[in-house]
Curated annotation (Swiss-Prot):
Function: Represses a number of genes involved in the response to DNA damage (SOS response), including recA and lexA. Binds to the 16 bp palindromic sequence 5'-CTGTATATATATACAG-3'. In the presence of single-stranded DNA, RecA interacts with LexA causing an autocatalytic cleavage which disrupts the DNA-binding part of LexA, leading to derepression of the SOS regulon and eventually DNA repair.
Marked site positions, Cleavage: 84-85
Name the UniProt record assigns to this protein: LexA repressor
Catalyzed reactions: Hydrolysis of Ala-|-Gly bond in repressor LexA
Keyword set includes Oxidoreductase: no
Length: 202
């Protein structure tokens, strides 16, 4: 799903909440009334915009013909630049969704992360690539992980011994990142399960 404007997000949230509360979507007239539009036609324009962005499907010929598209139907979310201190999968980090079958990766991918930098180039993870990530904290030494150190997110190979974690690059021009778990905040966000070369699937 492409990023929504503030007004489109209000319409989307109203539809979702209405379905949750009543079991059915609102009519155009109900949307217009709730959000202060002058006419149902204004609501219709916002619905068309939501459909173009992949957030909903409009079923023609029905006053309540609105269907929210699930994450599975939208595809895997693509995470771009992550703001400090915010959840990785926060809506504002999602650049879009790509129709990639999660089951083509083992274990299944939960999201795609846009790679920034060349610290993992020796194993074929390049700047701008899309890294397929399985969301888990169950990881082992030697695996390539997505980790958060304090507020920074990075992709590195994991080496943990006692209270010390080393995040190893796959590029001799970069140094390992050493984390003292007694002094720094450290979280595993997921396990790298595959890579899509930049532009290959887009």
């Amino acid at each position: 799903m492409k990023a929504l404007t503030t007004r489109q997000q209000e319409v989307f949230d109203l539809i979702r909440d209405h379905i949750s509360q009543t079991g059915m979507p609102p009519t155009r007239a109900e949307i217009a009334q709730r959000l202060g539009f002058r006419s149902p036609n204004a609501a219709e324009e916002h619905l068309k915009a939501l459909a173009r962005k992949g957030a909903i499907e409009i079923v023609s010929g029905a006053s309540r013909g609105i269907r929210l598209l699930t994450e599975e139907e939208q595809g895997l979310p693509l995470i771009g630049r992550v703001a400090a201190g915010e959840p990785l999968l926060a809506q504002q980090h999602i650049e879009g969704h790509y129709q990639v079958d999660p089951s083509m990766f083992k274990p299944n991918a939960d999201f795609l992360l846009r790679v920034s930098g060349m610290s993992m180039k020796d194993i074929g993870i390049l700047d701008g690539d899309l890294l397929a990530v399985h969301k888990t904290q169950d990881v082992r030494n030697g695996q390539v992980v997505v980790a958060r150190i304090d507020e920074e997110v990075t992709v590195k190979r994991l080496k943990k011994q006692g209270n010390v974690v080393e995040l190893l690059p796959e590029n001799s021009e970069f140094s390992p990142i050493v984390v003292d778990l007694r002094q720094q905040s450290f979280t595993i966000e997921g396990l790298a399960v595959g890579v899509i070369r930049n532009g290959e699937w887009l």
